[in-house]
From Swiss-Prot:
The protein's assembly and partners: Forms a complex with DabB.
Organism: Geobacillus sp. (strain WCH70)
Main location group: membrane
Name listed for the protein in its UniProt record: Probable inorganic carbon transporter subunit DabA
Annotated localization: Cell membrane
Example of a GO cellular component annotation carried by this entry: plasma membrane
Function comment: Part of an energy-coupled inorganic carbon pump.
Gene name, Swiss-Prot/TrEMBL: dabA
Pfam families tied to this protein: DabA (PF10070)
Length: 881
């Protein structure tokens, strides 16, 4: 007879996990894959809109919503308060909610009457949430206890991919997750500091992990035992990370998820390190350091609690909300429920589990988006025109930015002017170096690699004079900053600077507009830049000692190609007006860390005027016009290109480059100049009426706009791109007579002039991607402001010269402040909708686009943006899913 020995001893989970860990873990591959859970974060001085989930687009939007809810308890769908407010304002039609519900029910394997399922779902969608009194009632707990033998399949494996420090905290142990975050914030601030701190982090030049390893053993915020555990860490960060994973007992199959969870704990600091690594050409080097430090610290903190024993799943706690749902929304009582056969009980509980808060949020959001699409369709269909436009006196090329739409509309209403829209870098992949600057700025979208550098230059004598005046101003600022940071000099600073700064504060507070004018006049008079030229020609010989890794200027072929591509992409290939104005855009604000977020996203968070000036100058070159003529684009001899900047905070045009004008161009310029004050007044009047506190008030729009731009206490000088909801790619005739309320990106495009589809493909890969990033950043900052936003402007701290925090111990805040998306504490201004892309082109052109660009097709299929095409002949709208 065979005897079987059964061990009654509980296996050591920690030892079992360590045995499962391979010693040859590919740390770099793990970190690379895990880093997709976060997005790179640019310094705030060059604020770039970031799509927080750009690395997760291979998942559907709904899958990412589920994942982040499980990992970080973040709700990525708008709240019920937002949905109900949208319904009250007429932005959300209930009929679309019912349609979405019926579509969802059609996809479900129902094992209960359809009518009952519909009643339950409608009640769950439209009625109040389950009251806490019901969830904690003795009758419900008694009912759940009677059903303890019922087994429902549900996924609780997400617990395995959450940080052990967080799980211990949730079990009532010490606040280990908070302590760990506080430690990482401290070390990241020290390492990433951009000369804001007077004393730099020792050993910083040798790397993050090296410096931390040298310093942490003397960290007084850790106890003696914790410091002892960190004394003998490996010298190599990869080996340290590998060791930490083993000591924590993380199974090989869960390592990627575990690293993701730690990156998502502080996505701002981790995102800044990711950006730094990418800038150095070593895409994930600093994240390896970061995770090696973080997991080593986690092990040092929680070692006494290892091996970690996962708590048993509580079936009763799982059943309670499902039973409460049927009591509250289904109208059942405990007595009637117990009379149901077990199979029917299980069917209803399974259905309630599937129709969870995330599914309800999905249906509400899609109904809101359907309503917006239907309203936009009605507006466009009733105003679009197919007839050819009349010959314009002047044509103006604007950035496709939503803030350009009202200005363009009022401009076209004011006279015989025609406007076009494109990405505000005007197709120029350049770095720009202003006069006497040691730094060149990438003035193109972050997804575009600069290929050229364009520099401002003038005579050596002019540079010398300008440098002297400029250095005098900078030295005052530099001295003030150094005194402020110095331990002893800071004690003298109030005595030295008090009277002058007191007067400045008083003037800025009482009369911001007047004080601003005086300040700008002084700056212009003292440090006025001399007339400069641009290094457009590759063979330009510049009197400069600056070095660059890019070619300076363009060859003739490159000049022609860039100009041709932009004209072709916009459909502007003939009928040129005597005057063509290339308009960049810039925002003017005071005391605003987020100033760059109001500038041009297509120019890397800088003003677009430099690019406008370069493009206009290229268009006036004889060799460019000759090259364009060979490609079939003939520009009349009397057509002159000029450059301007649209100041979005005050809705005005500032002239940057006006060469000698032909007679026809001069007449057009004078006519345009004569209309600008009227256009500015009307555009400001429309824009200011949407700002909180100004609704319905009688104010001089020009004066009020300038006051807000100069007032350093103004938390909302303009709305920026709040409200953005759609991007229209098509002829201006489609939308010229529509009031799109500053909510739509407008990119000019004529499918008839793009037989190959190349121009449309370029618009999709560039401008559409930038617009999507902007849209999803506003979305994230609205629906999850505590995680993806940056809180209240008035309580923010600029830290380490790179970003903002709330207080001195928060994550590096990556998103927008609530003043950028909220009208008040209770009311949102920005409607969190995924971008609706509308393309005016035949259906076969869209099909070809999908074939050629599977990445874009995936965005549409996975719900990261919405796509509609308009047939140019029939006007029929087709939604692509």
């Amino acid at each position: 007879m065979n005897t079987t020995t059964v061990s009654l001893e509980r296996p050591n989970v920690h030892e079992r996990r360590r045995e499962n860990v391979a010693t040859d873990i590919n740390v770099n591959a793990l970190v690379k894959n895990a880093s997709k859970a976060i997005a790179p974060l640019w310094p705030i001085a060059t604020f770039v809109a970031r799509h927080p989930w750009m690395g997760l687009e291979h998942f559907s939007f709904e899958q990412v919503v589920h994942r982040l809810k499980l990992l970080r308890d973040i709700d990525l769908y708008p709240s019920m308060a937002m949905f109900r407010a949208a319904q009250r304002k007429g932005e959300l039609n209930p009929k679309f909610l019912e349609m979405r519900l019926q579509r969802w029910l059609d996809e479900q394997p129902l094992t209960m009457p359809r009518e009952e399922a519909e009643r339950f779902c409608r009640a769950a969608l439209l009625h109040e949430e389950i009251p806490n009194e019901l969830l904690t009632s003795s009758s419900l707990k008694s009912l759940a206890a009677k059903m303890k033998d019922m087994r429902l399949r549900y996924d609780s494996n997400h617990l395995l991919t959450r940080p052990l420090s967080l799980l211990l905290e949730e079990q009532g142990k010490e606040k280990w997750a908070r302590v760990l975050d506080h430690q990482m914030i401290k070390w990241c601030k020290l390492f990433l500091d951009e000369s804001q701190a007077l004393w730099a982090m020792p050993y910083r030049e040798k790397g993050f992990y090296y410096a931390w390893r040298k310093l942490v053993i003397n960290d007084p915020s850790l106890n003696k035992q914790q410091r002892e555990r960190l004394k003998d860490l490996p010298h190599d960060p990869e080996e340290a990370l590998r060791q930490a994973l083993m000591l924590l007992g993380i199974p090989h199959g869960e390592m990627k998820g575990y690293l993701e969870a730690h990156l998502l704990s502080l996505p701002g600091w981790a995102g800044m390190l990711l950006w730094r690594s990418q800038q150095s050409g070593q895409a994930h080097l600093l994240l390896v350091d970061y995770l090696a430090i973080r997991l080593s610290l986690e092990w040092a903190l929680i070692a006494p609690h290892l091996p970690f024993a996962k708590q048993k799943d509580d079936d009763e706690a799982f059943l309670l909300p499902l039973l409460a749902a049927w009591m509250h929304w289904g109208g059942w009582t405990p007595e009637k429920w117990l009379q149901l056969p077990q199979a029917e009980q299980q069917a209803r509980l399974s259905f309630a589990y599937r129709f969870d808060k995330i599914v309800r949020g999905k249906l509400w959001l899609e109904a809101w988006e359907d309503t917006q699409e239907a309203q936009l369709k009605k507006r466009i269909a009733s105003h679009s025109q197919n007839n050819e436009p009349k010959q314009a006196v002047a044509q103006l090329i604007f950035c496709m930015d939503v803030r350009s739409e009202p200005f363009r509309r009022h401009l076209e209403q004011a006279g015989p002017f025609e406007t076009y829209g494109c990405a505000g870098f005007f197709g120029l992949p350049i770095k720009t170096r202003e006069l006497d600057s040691s730094h060149a700025h990438a003035s193109c979208p972050v997804i575009v690699e600069p290929r050229h550098e364009v520099q401002e230059f003038t005579s050596a004598e002019n540079v010398k004079k300008y440098r002297g005046r400029r250095n005098a101003l900078l030295s005052v600022s530099h001295t003030f900053k150094k005194m402020k940071q110095h331990l002893f000099a800071s004690l003298l600073l109030p005595e030295v600077s008090g009277p002058l700064l007191g007067l400045h504060t008083l003037a800025r507070s009482i009369a911001p507009s007047g004080a601003g004018r005086v300040f700008h006049q002084f700056q212009d008079n003292w440090a006025q830049k001399p007339a400069t030229e641009l290094s457009l020609n590759r063979e330009s010989s510049l009197e400069t000692t600056e070095t660059t890794d890019l070619p300076v200027g363009f060859s003739t072929e490159e000049k022609v190609r860039y100009v041709y591509q932009l004209f072709k992409g916009m459909g502007l290939t003939s009928r040129f007006a005597p005057l063509v104005v290339v308009c960049g855009h810039e925002s003017t604000t005071t005391n605003n860390p987020y100033a760059s977020s109001l500038d041009c996203g297509a120019c890397g968070g800088a003003a677009g005027g430099f690019n406008a000036r370069v493009f206009a100058a290229l268009c006036n070159l004889k060799e460019v016009r000759e090259g364009l003529a060979k490609e079939g684009i003939v520009i009349p001899e009397d057509t002159v290109f000029v450059a301007a900047e649209h100041m979005t905070t005050v809705d005005d045009l500032c002239w940057l480059y006006v060469p000698t004008l032909s007679e026809a161009a001069q007449k057009a310029f004078d006519m345009l100049q004569g209309k600008l004050e009227e256009v500015s007044r009307n555009a400001n009047n429309e824009r200011l009426s949407k700002l909180p506190g100004l609704e319905g008030k009688k104010k001089d729009p020009l004066a009020e706009a300038h006051r807000r731009a100069e007032d350093w206490s103004e938390i909302r000088p303009e709305w920026g791109l709040a409200g953005n909801a759609a991007l229209i790619i098509g002829r201006r005739e489609l939308t010229k007579h529509c009031n799109l309320e500053g909510r739509v990106f407008l990119h000019s495009y004529d499918w008839r002039k793009d037989p190959s589809g190349e121009a449309l493909a370029n618009i999709i890969t560039g401008p559409v991607t930038v617009a999507q990033w902007i849209n999803l950043q506003y979305y994230a900052s609205t629906v999850a402001p505590h995680y993806y936003g940056s809180g209240n402007k008035t309580t923010q701290t600029v830290t380490a010269g790179i970003g903002v925090m709330q207080g001195n111990a928060s994550d590096l805040l990556a998103g927008l402040p609530w003043q950028s998306v909220m009208a008040s504490d209770e009311e949102i201004f920005h409607s969190p909708l995924r971008l609706l892309v509308i393309i005016e082109a035949p259906q076969q052109n869209i099909e070809r686009l999908f074939e050629d660009d599977p990445h874009f097709r995936r965005k549409v299929k996975n719900g990261w943006l919405r796509l509609v095409s308009i047939d140019p002949d029939s006007g029929e709208w087709k939604a692509w899913r």
